[in-house]
């Protein structure tokens, strides 16, 4: 090393000191002043851990006055360098800048600058960086992205729907799985995919007030999505940050009532720019052609301004056929433009169902089937497709063609891509329902009060009287006052106490229609037998309800009984219990199904006992018999219940209003016959279509198997532990697939993404995570991994390295240069660029003659043959071959151009294939539905041309490099 006063050097071991200046030199030592950090260092001359900073032609450097110079020439005189070039701010040419006047705070951003400046990292960090780039790329390209990292069981039909919908641009769908099939999880998976891919950045979830907290917790626990609940208080607090409070958070959760009640809040929600709207319990959105409900109008206004919309309802035709059409109209007003046309189209489902069944069966297509398909797809030339099906070609190709025809049929002639509905009949693994009808004698106190109420209720409508007669305890209280203790003589209470005593170790869910009944029942159980119970009703706050639900769920020391009013049977799930008591009966079959669905859902491991105590000779007995014998609504799910009820509602109400069984037998017979007929119709037409479309068949099973195969990925485990080590996190193995991760004092950063201040317990095993709520399931999608990768890449970890290759087959001193380039298209995340051209790493391995050996030398196996070099020695090695490294980088820059072009071509082809498919679909739809807007077609064409331009302008940047020197020692 030769030193001269004024030379600029950088410390190999303390790179944060900035750029140093030689201020004193004697025979044995050199003194360097680091002005940026106001530090002085004295080094031994012969082995100083510092590196001379030199810049080259093409570099941009900064003067201590703040202006920059693009270097065109470098002159050395008396050991000092002078840079000549053009000022970037004034374009003045031939400007001279002596190295002494360089900025003290100079930063080396290019990996080659860092390498030459002695900022050399460890080789294990270089390997970590390359793996981070590779994994980031693979995750972006993974078609199952957003599905693998959720903390939920791998249930095929849920995965299929989420996969089908989640990868669409601006999905607009109605998720209408039957009660208990997991719509909330499906919605969460769709949101997760949309957010991860950048297709949705701002998401609004609108739910009934009672379900806000449940959604908040589900999104956070299962998907690591942190929503904010917005109410009046939160909106007022947010005014300091924005005029529109809904602009202050990206992921927002609020109740429908909240935005329906306030005109101002409603307008603010509509004005906020959402990418995705999710509405739960969408069957509350009533509509008819003359007068839509306020709730419907509110959601319609938001849906018109929002690209993606998910509506969730357990009962697609609940509240009538018109409301079902209206919900579909919210999603796709072009496809569902006229109610009468919709009704007419539904009548034509049968031939479509037959054609789909023929295609799905895999059997040879009959001429009739072919003619039917050709007629239904008249705008498409299907003959070539039939020829492929009948040829001796590969099974895979035939299967693809059959699937293409099925997709086209369903898209154009059914509710297609808009409605997904799975039924229990199609999903295996549900428990049996065991019904226990318990007739009981009517107490004289009730008989008297009911008789008097009948005499006094002369002006009451039949419906109001029928409703009243179902709840004798309420009638009794009206006469006796609030202090009346009906539960002292009601035989249902005595029976219930005995049931609970006999089943002390069972959790029992009790549902009553009224909140007052639920509260008094809890009091009776507590006072008479000291039974631990908790109540759940509409008068409680969300937090109080959550506490009640948690107390019931608690295994040790928890409540034996949870008593819910009717609202308790919407949205809350208690599949850990299998005992359901209906203290009274709801007025319609849909509510009955909702009640049973709290226990009878996916995840229920045992058969369900449904206990229905009723008072003989009252409306309760008549309704129980009609539900049981007319609909079999207790024994199995009843999708036809609403239609049967509407057909016979006048008769049912008249019978319930009198409380007499005259006319009950014929009503039961006619109801059972109609129910059977409707079920047969559903079996024939639309439901079979939807079943084929919604449960995914073998595709769904394959999807679940693929995701299961990625669980516990050993590459992920190794990468995560290596990442945590590099960042400086403490890891404590707790056994049973669990590791406790906590922040450490000497971390690379002050706080680690996704890691709480107090640390957390992690597992890589899905089964363990599902059984232990206190654990984080770590996957490639988890914020601790995603955030860690971002941290490594932005903090420059592993951007340079020097390694030794001990190989006597090569001459000692042979050089290899490993370069990692990244292809990056600068485009908005929403454009979908990440799907076709995410940041793409390209590895080159240049030998000393400028040949690229990367195809012959695989990274991991080569990395295992290398040995590390300490930083000081590495810096010396780099300095001794600086000229050769420059030459190899220049050669690599030429080689990389061909590789970039190939990446651009592949990305463009993939994008055009995907988007042309969508364009063709809309053009075909336009042929059968003139209401498809031209803008929709131009939107896709515009998107294709924009993406094509972004891909064409994709640039490459050298991200990291490693010098490898052959050694024989």
Swiss-Prot record:
Enzyme class: hydrolase
CDD domains in the cross-refs: DEXDc_RapA (cd18011), SF2_C_SNF (cd18793)
Listed PROSITE patterns: HELICASE_ATP_BIND_1, HELICASE_CTER
Domain of life: Bacteria
Molecular-function GO term, any one: hydrolase activity, acting on acid anhydrides
Biological process per Gene Ontology, one example term: regulation of DNA-templated transcription
InterPro entries named among the record's database cross-references: Helicase_ATP-bd (IPR014001), Helicase_C-like (IPR001650), Helicase_RapA (IPR023949), P-loop_NTPase (IPR027417), RapA_C (IPR022737), SNF2-like_sf (IPR038718), SNF2/RAD54-like_C (IPR049730), SNF2_N (IPR000330)
Aminoacyl-tRNA synthetase as UniProt keyword: no
Keywords: Activator, ATP-binding, DNA-binding, Helicase, Hydrolase, Nucleotide-binding, Transcription, Transcription regulation
Residues annotated as transmembrane: none
UniProt keyword Metal-binding present: no
Helicase C-terminal domain location: 492-672
EC numbers for this chain: 3.6.4.-
Binding site for ATP: 177-184
Membership in a protein family: Belongs to the SNF2/RAD54 helicase family. RapA subfamily.
Subunit structure and binding partners: Interacts with the RNAP. Has a higher affinity for the core RNAP than for the holoenzyme. Its ATPase activity is stimulated by binding to RNAP.
Protein name in the entry: RNA polymerase-associated protein RapA
Species whose genome carries this gene: Aliivibrio salmonicida (strain LFI1238)
Gene field: rapA
């Amino acid at each position: 090393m030769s030193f001269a006063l004024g030379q600029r050097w950088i410390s190999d071991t303390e790179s944060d000191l900035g750029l140093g200046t030689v201020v004193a030199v004697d025979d044995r030592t050199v003194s360097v002043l680091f002005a940026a950090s106001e530090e002085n260092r004295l080094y031994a001359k012969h082995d100083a851990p510092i590196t001379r900073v030199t810049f080259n032609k093409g570099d941009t450097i900064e003067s201590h006055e703040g202006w920059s110079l693009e270097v065109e020439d470098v002159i050395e005189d008396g050991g000092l360098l002078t840079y000549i070039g053009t000022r970037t701010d004034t374009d003045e040419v031939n400007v001279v800048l002596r190295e002494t006047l360089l900025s003290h705070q100079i930063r080396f951003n290019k990996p080659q600058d860092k390498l030459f400046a002695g900022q050399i990292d460890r080789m294990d960090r270089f390997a970590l960086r390359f793996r981070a780039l590779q994994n980031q790329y693979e995750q972006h390209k993974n078609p199952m992205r957003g599905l693998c990292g959720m903390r939920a069981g791998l249930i095929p039909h849920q995965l299929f729907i989420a996969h089908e919908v989640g990868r669409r641009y601006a999905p607009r769908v109605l998720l209408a799985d039957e009660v208990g099939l997991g719509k909330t999880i499906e919605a969460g998976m769709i949101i997760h995919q949309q957010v991860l891919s950048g297709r949705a950045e701002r998401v609004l979830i609108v739910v009934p007030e009672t379900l806000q907290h449940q959604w908040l917790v589900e999104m956070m626990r299962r998907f690591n999505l942190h929503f904010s609940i917005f109410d009046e208080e939160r909106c007022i607090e947010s005014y300091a940050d924005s005029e529109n409070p809904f602009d202050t958070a990206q992921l927002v959760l609020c109740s429908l009532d909240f935005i329906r009640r306030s005109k101002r809040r409603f307008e603010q929600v509509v004005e906020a720019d959402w990418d995705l709207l999710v509405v739960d319990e969408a069957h509350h959105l009533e509509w008819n052609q003359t007068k839509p409900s306020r709730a419907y109008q509110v959601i319609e206004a938001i849906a018109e301004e929002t690209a993606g919309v998910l509506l969730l309802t357990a009962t697609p035709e609940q509240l009538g056929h018109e409301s079902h059409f209206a919900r579909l109209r919210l999603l796709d007003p072009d496809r569902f433009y006229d109610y009468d046309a919709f009704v007419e189209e539904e009548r034509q489902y049968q031939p479509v169902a037959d054609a789909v069944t023929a295609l799905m069966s895999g059997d040879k297509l009959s001429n009739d089937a072919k003619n039917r398909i050709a007629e239904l797809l008249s705008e498409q030339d299907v003959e070539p497709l039939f020829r492929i099906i009948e040829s001796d070609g590969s099974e895979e190709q035939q299967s693809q063609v059959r699937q293409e025809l099925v997709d086209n049929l369903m898209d154009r002639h059914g509710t297609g891509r808009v409605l997904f509905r799975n039924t229990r009949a199609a999903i295996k693994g549900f428990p049996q329902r065991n019904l226990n009808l318990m007739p009981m004698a009517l107490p004289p106190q009730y008989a008297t009060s009911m008789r008097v109420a009948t005499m006094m209720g002369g002006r009451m409508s039949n419906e109001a009287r029928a409703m009243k007669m179902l709840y004798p305890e309420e009638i009794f209280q009206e006469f006796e006052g609030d202090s009346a203790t009906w539960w002292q003589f009601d035989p249902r209470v005595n029976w219930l106490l005995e049931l609970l005593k006999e089943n002390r170790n069972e959790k029992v869910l009790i549902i009553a229609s009224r909140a007052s009944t639920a509260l008094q029942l809890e009091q009776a159980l507590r006072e008479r037998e000291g039974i631990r119970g908790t109540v759940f009703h509409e008068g409680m706050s969300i937090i109080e309800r959550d506490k009640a639900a948690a107390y019931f769920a608690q295994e040790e020391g928890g409540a034996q009984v949870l008593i819910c009013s009717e609202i308790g049977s919407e949205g809350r799930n208690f599949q850990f219990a299998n005992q359901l008591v209906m203290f009274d009966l709801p007025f319609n079959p849909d509510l009955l199904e909702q009640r049973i669905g709290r226990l009878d859902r996916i995840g229920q491991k045992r058969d369900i006992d449904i206990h229905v105590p009723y008072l003989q000779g009252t409306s309760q007995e008549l309704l129980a018999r009609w539900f049981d014998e007319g609909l079999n609504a207790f024994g199995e799910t009843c999708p036809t219940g609403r239609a049967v009820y509407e057909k016979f509602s006048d008769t049912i109400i008249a019978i319930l209003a009198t409380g007499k069984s005259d006319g009950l037998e014929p009503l039961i017979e006619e109801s059972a016959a109609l129910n059977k007929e409707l079920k047969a119709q559903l079996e024939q037409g639309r439901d079979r279509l939807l079943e084929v479309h919604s449960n995914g068949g073998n595709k769904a099973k394959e999807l679940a198997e693929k995701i299961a195969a990625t669980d516990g990925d050993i590459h992920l485990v190794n990468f995560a532990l290596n990442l945590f080590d590099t960042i400086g996190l403490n890891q404590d193995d707790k056994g049973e697939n669990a590791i406790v991760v906590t922040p450490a004092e000497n971390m690379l950063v002050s706080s680690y993404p996704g890691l709480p201040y107090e640390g957390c317990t992690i597992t890589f095993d899905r089964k363990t995570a599902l059984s232990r709520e206190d654990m984080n399931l770590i996957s490639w999608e988890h914020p601790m991994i995603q955030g860690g990768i971002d941290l490594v890449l932005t903090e420059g970890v592993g951007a340079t390295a020097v390694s030794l290759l001990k190989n006597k087959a090569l001459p000692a001193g042979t050089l290899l240069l490993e370069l990692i380039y990244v292809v990056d298209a600068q485009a908005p995340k929403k454009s979908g660029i990440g799907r076709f051209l995410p940041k793409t790493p390209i590895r080159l391995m240049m030998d000393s003659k400028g040949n690229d050996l990367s195809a012959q030398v695989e990274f991991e196996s080569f990395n295992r043959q290398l040995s590390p070099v300490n930083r000081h020695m590495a810096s010396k090695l780099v300095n001794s071959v600086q000229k050769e490294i420059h030459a190899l980088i220049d050669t690599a820059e030429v080689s990389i151009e061909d590789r970039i072009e190939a990446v651009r071509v592949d990305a463009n082809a993939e994008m055009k294939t995907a988007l042309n498919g969508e364009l063709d679909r809309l053009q075909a739809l336009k042929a059968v539905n003139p209401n498809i807007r031209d803008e929709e077609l131009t939107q896709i064409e515009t998107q294709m041309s924009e993406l094509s331009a972004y891909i064409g302008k994709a640039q490459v940047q050298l991200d990291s490099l490693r010098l490898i020197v052959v050694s024989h020692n």
